[in-house]
Amino acid sequence: MNNLIIYFLRFFDPETAHKIAIEILSKNYFFSYDTPELITKISNIEFKNPIGLAAGLDKSGKCFDGIFKLGFSSVEIGTVTPLGQQGNPKPRVFRLHEDRAVINRYGFNNDGMEVVKNRLLKIRHRNGILGINIGPNKNSLNPIKDYNIIAKKLSKYSDYIAINVSSPNTPGLRDFEG
């Protein structure tokens, strides 16, 4: 089944394939399994296993439950910004067939913190550890304020917050890397 889905997605440009994957994952067609031997504890957070998915796939919290059902013990959504934004102009996702890889230059495209918060409010039970990756809007005049606003708004809906300071596609962001 998985090979069939991957084969099907290759007929689309990478960004459309990403959107289709998000839609499929949001339907929760998958089942999960637990293996007690793989339980991992980090800083008082218990993970079902040591495999997590970093931010970038589910940018706006649309399908993280489906991702948990694939077997990931943690999912990080985002990068979420205070206001929704479109990100960089297309094309911004490129397949490297020989390397079996993808390069993305999305630029923090997401629905914004209020929309993400409303999605998280609808979830009654999570099937794993949820992180939220946060960043400033592309045209922000005060990125530090953006981080503060988002962290305060979304931290109670997640197990942890990750602060994104390394996107080369967001002007001035890498200045925070020190």
Regions found by a protein language model. Give the residues of each.
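Conserved alpha/beta-domain cores
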Residues: 47, 55-58, 109-178
